Amino acid sequence: MKINLDRTSSGFCIGVQGTIHVAEEKLAAKETLFSLGDVVHNEVEVKRLENLGLTTIDEAVFKELQNTSVLIRAHGEPPETYATAERNKLDITDTTCPVVSKLQRTARLLCQLGYQVIIYGKHTHPEVIGINGHCSNRAVIIKHADLSDPEELKTLDTTIKTALISQTTMDVPGFYELKTNLEKRFAESDETAGKPWTAIRDIDITAAMTGIGTMPRTVFKDTICRQVSSRNKKLHDFALANSCVIFVAGRKSSNGQVLFGICRSANPRSYFIEDIEDLEDSWFRDNEGSPVESIGICGATSTPMWLLEKVAEFIDGRFNHRDA
């Protein structure tokens, strides 16, 4: 039984790497450190950091803190979080992912330009909450690219200037499906808005802000992180190349759900686990009861490499040694 560990398209993305590195440095220096929300959407990694001294808090506790240090994770936060920190004299360690920071700025400027902002994303995801905060909490958040949820469309106004952006970890095909469906929806109410929406760049937004340029009524900006989305094809091929796949991620990980779906579509014998306790012996046998030829082990952008290695070592020790 060959065990293949994916080291090229699994493990922490750059944004999460930065957050974990900063947290480890501060904890190693024995500093008191609170994290506003789970530092990463992986319970195993959160527990490891909490064992080093990190304390995870929710928003209610955060608002009561005074004169201490708080870590802002890679997902980012809305402006009101920083206002609270200033009032309470909190020392903020801001590890917002640079890609997310750029997206927050884009959302803020689009709102200032008078655009209705649509965010392709998950309503309760912390990144989306942060982006919406930069739109004064007035953005239209749409998770279903087919526009199948009427609740998501209640505040959508098809008669005004509109800009479409995305949570950084959403799927690229879904984003463009949503764009197409919005074009159709807007065309139903106004034929002049029925033409394809215009892709915009940072320079277009800057020109509009300074008054030296203008932007069309309906625009979109693909803000999906390519370091994340580029993993899709690689994981698809990785899943195809193995007899079965063990996908390691936290249940809360949005990116994990997307990537696992890709693995499962490529290889039906793909299994989602958080840690080794979730493994089942039957997964590693073919229909005749013999060991499968190969096992692929991979994970999300919020899955630490040490955990993937732990899973690989456990499977190797349990099945290869037992079958020898």
Swiss-Prot record:
Q: Which residues bind (2E)-4-hydroxy-3-methylbut-2-enyl diphosphate?
A: H41, H75, H125, T168, S253, S254, N255, S302
Leading EC class: oxidoreductase
Q: How is the cofactor bound?
A: Binds 1 [4Fe-4S] cluster per subunit.
Q: Name one GO molecular function term.
A: 4-hydroxy-3-methylbut-2-enyl diphosphate reductase activity
Q: Which residues bind dimethylallyl diphosphate?
A: H41, H75, H125, S253, S254, N255, S302
- Which residues constitute the catalytic centre? E127 (proton donor)
Q: Which EC number(s) are documented for this chain?
A: 1.17.7.4
Q: In which pathway does it act?
A: Isoprenoid biosynthesis; dimethylallyl diphosphate biosynthesis; dimethylallyl diphosphate from (2E)-4-hydroxy-3-methylbutenyl diphosphate: step 1/1; Isoprenoid biosynthesis; isopentenyl diphosphate biosynthesis via DXP pathway; isopentenyl diphosphate from 1-deoxy-D-xylulose 5-phosphate: step 6/6
A Gene Ontology biological process noted in the UniProt record is: isopentenyl diphosphate biosynthetic process, methylerythritol 4-phosphate pathway
Q: Which reaction does it catalyse?
A: isopentenyl diphosphate + 2 oxidized [2Fe-2S]-[ferredoxin] + H2O = (2E)-4-hydroxy-3-methylbut-2-enyl diphosphate + 2 reduced [2Fe-2S]-[ferredoxin] + 2 H(+); dimethylallyl diphosphate + 2 oxidized [2Fe-2S]-[ferredoxin] + H2O = (2E)-4-hydroxy-3-methylbut-2-enyl diphosphate + 2 reduced [2Fe-2S]-[ferredoxin] + 2 H(+)
Where on this chain does [4Fe-4S] cluster bind? C13, C97, C225
Binding, isopentenyl diphosphate? H41, H75, H125, S253, S254, N255, S302
Say which domain of life the source belongs to: Bacteria
**Keyword entries, A-Z:** 4Fe-4S, Iron, Iron-sulfur, Isoprene biosynthesis, Metal-binding, Oxidoreductase
Q: Which cofactor does it need?
A: [4Fe-4S] cluster
The cross-references to InterPro entries, in alphabetical order and at most eight, read:
LytB/IspH
Report whether 4Fe-4S shows up as a keyword of the record: yes
**Family assignment?**
Belongs to the IspH family.
Concerning HAMAP family, the annotation shows: IspH (MF_00191)
The task this protein performs is described as:
Catalyzes the conversion of 1-hydroxy-2-methyl-2-(E)-butenyl 4-diphosphate (HMBPP) into a mixture of isopentenyl diphosphate (IPP) and dimethylallyl diphosphate (DMAPP). Acts in the terminal step of the DOXP/MEP pathway for isoprenoid precursor biosynthesis.
By what name is this protein known? 4-hydroxy-3-methylbut-2-enyl diphosphate reductase
* Organism in which the protein naturally occurs: Chlorobium limicola (strain DSM 245 / NBRC 103803 / 6330)
Q: What is the lineage of its organism?
A: Bacteria, Pseudomonadati, Chlorobiota, Chlorobiia, Chlorobiales
